[in-house]
């Protein structure tokens, strides 16, 4: 899909999604610059492009996800590469100051942004960076960004995938999924919290519901229970733990399956239910607590998503958001839960650019104000 516009915005082209935990940035690097353009290009623009494309880390917390870079695509009639950068929201003032130091406001006075932080930090952009924010609706950006990324080739790879044999850990494997005909689609966006959208076409979508129990809940509870310092550390601990040490299962209550209502003995009856017993609290490890927290949050998201899919009569559920970044554990849990509890009627889908769709949607909004 090529997006063209008679009046192209001036470079540099950015889209920002300022979330409660992470800032996601999409940056378009033009590769079709003419000799005349290069001669006229000001030093500050060259400096910004070189800084962003020649580094994979910015300061101590900024990361460019090189493996997600989209090469040689066409946007607004220009050829270029699309880069994806993230950093903690708490470091946003440092980012704004960096833009000021590189004289960003001499090139652009308005930034295209979405997410709650576009409102929360609007004054900081204005007073520190001499920049104004063109604020776009985050759910609009999410849908537009998702559909755009799905429509362009991911450097010859599949953007969408699922897990085959999700119920068998030794046979479970990642498989490509063709999303050329995406509608209808249930989109479950897992960030700090969770929003669920029913998408029937590129212009026909609605927010169905959401839950406050999301990625922020997982990291917050893990920090309290285990003392972990980061999302990556929390996931590492969870990967080594056993949630059944903290959770109370159906078999712990019934001695086996609860056959009358079709509940298998391994199903969780009460998340953290074993923690009411002193002897269990004395033997549970921090890794077990991290795993139980991950399973609790993931199971809840899967349960809400399944009910929404049934109510909306949609059988394809795509999970996106930065909660799923480097979090194969939760993806496989979601894949298995949806397949098992729907008796194979629902398929859990995932996307490679999971957390960046809002930022891409903001980038696509550039011509609206340029």
From Swiss-Prot:
Instruction: Report the subcellular localization.
Output: Cytoplasm
Q: Which residues form a coiled coil?
A: none
Per its UniProt entry, what is the enzyme's top EC class, as one word? transferase
Q: Which SUPFAM superfamilies match?
A: Actin-like ATPase domain
Where is it made, tissue-wise?
Highly expressed in the liver.
- Please tell me one Gene Ontology term that the record gives under cellular component: cytosol
Q: How is its activity regulated?
A: Subject to allosteric regulation, exists in two distinct conformational states, a catalytically incompetent (or open) conformation stabilized by the binding of acetyl(acyl)-CoA, and a catalytically competent (or closed) conformation stabilized by ATP-binding. Acetyl-CoA and its thioesters act as allosteric inhibitors and compete with the ATP-binding site. Strongly inhibited by acetyl-CoA, malonyl-CoA and palmitoyl CoA and modestly inhibited by CoA. Inhibited by calcium hopantenate.
Reaction(s) catalysed by this chain, per the record, are: (R)-pantothenate + ATP = (R)-4'-phosphopantothenate + ADP + H(+)
**GO MF entry, a single one:** pantothenate kinase activity
Q: Which pathway does the record list?
A: Cofactor biosynthesis; coenzyme A biosynthesis; CoA from (R)-pantothenate: step 1/5
Transmembrane portions of the chain: none
Keyword Kinase on entry: yes
- Which keywords are on file for this protein? ATP-binding, Coenzyme A biosynthesis, Cytoplasm, Kinase, Nucleotide-binding, Transferase
Q: Which GO terms describe its biological process?
A: coenzyme A biosynthetic process
E.C. numbers: 2.7.1.33
Keyword check for ATP-binding, yes or no.
yes
S-S pairs: none
Xref: NCBIfam families = panK_eukar (TIGR00555)
Briefly state the protein's biological role: Catalyzes the phosphorylation of pantothenate to generate 4'-phosphopantothenate in the first and rate-determining step of coenzyme A (CoA) synthesis.
What quaternary structure, including any partners, is listed in this protein's UniProt entry? Homodimer.
Family stated for the protein in its record: Belongs to the type II pantothenate kinase family.
- This chain belongs to the protein called Pantothenate kinase 3
Organism this protein belongs to: Mus musculus (Mouse)
Q: What is the lineage of its organism?
A: Eukaryota, Metazoa, Chordata, Craniata, Vertebrata
């Amino acid at each position: 899909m090529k997006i063209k516009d008679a009046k192209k915005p001036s470079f540099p082209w950015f889209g920002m999604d300022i979330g409660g935990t992470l800032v996601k940035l999409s940056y378009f690097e033009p590769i079709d610059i003419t000799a005349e353009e290069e001669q006229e290009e000001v030093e500050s623009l060259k400096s910004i492009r070189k800084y962003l494309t020649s580094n994979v880390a910015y300061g101590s917390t900024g990361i460019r996800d090189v493996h997600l870079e989209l090469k040689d695509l066409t946007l607004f009639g220009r050829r270029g590469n699309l880069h994806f950068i993230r950093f903690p929201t708490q470091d946003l003032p440092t980012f704004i100051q960096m833009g000021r130091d590189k004289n960003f406001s001499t090139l652009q006075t308005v930034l295209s942004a979405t997410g709650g932080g576009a409102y929360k930090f609007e004054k900081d952009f204005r007073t520190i960076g001499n920049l104004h924010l063109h604020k776009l609706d985050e759910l609009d950006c999410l849908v537009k960004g998702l559909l755009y990324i799905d429509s362009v080739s991911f450097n010859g790879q599949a953007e969408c995938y699922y897990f085959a044999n999700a119920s068998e850990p030794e046979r479970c494997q990642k498989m490509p999924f063709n999303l050329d005909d995406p509608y209808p689609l249930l989109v479950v966006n897992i960030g700090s919290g969770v929003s669920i959208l029913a998408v029937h076409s590129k212009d026909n979508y609605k927010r169905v519901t959401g839950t406050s129990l999301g990625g922020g809940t997982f990291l917050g509870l893990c920090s309290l229970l285990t003392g972990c310092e980061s999302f990556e550390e929390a996931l590492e601990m969870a990967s080594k733990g056993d949630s059944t040490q903290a959770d109370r299962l159906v078999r712990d209550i019934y001695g086996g399956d609860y056959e009358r209502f079709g509940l298998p003995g391994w199903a969780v009856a009460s998340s953290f239910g074993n923690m009411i017993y002193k002897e269990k609290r004395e033997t549970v490890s921090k890794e077990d607590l991290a795993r139980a927290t991950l399973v609790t949050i993931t199971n809840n998201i899967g349960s809400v998503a399944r009910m929404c899919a049934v109510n909306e009569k949609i059988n394809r559920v795509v999970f996106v958001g930065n909660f799923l970044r480097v979090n194969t554990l939760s993806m496989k849990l979601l894949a298995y839960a949806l397949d098992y509890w729907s008796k194979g009627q629902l398929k859990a889908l995932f996307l490679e650019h999971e957390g960046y769709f809002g930022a891409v949607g903001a980038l696509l909004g550039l011509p609206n104000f340029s």
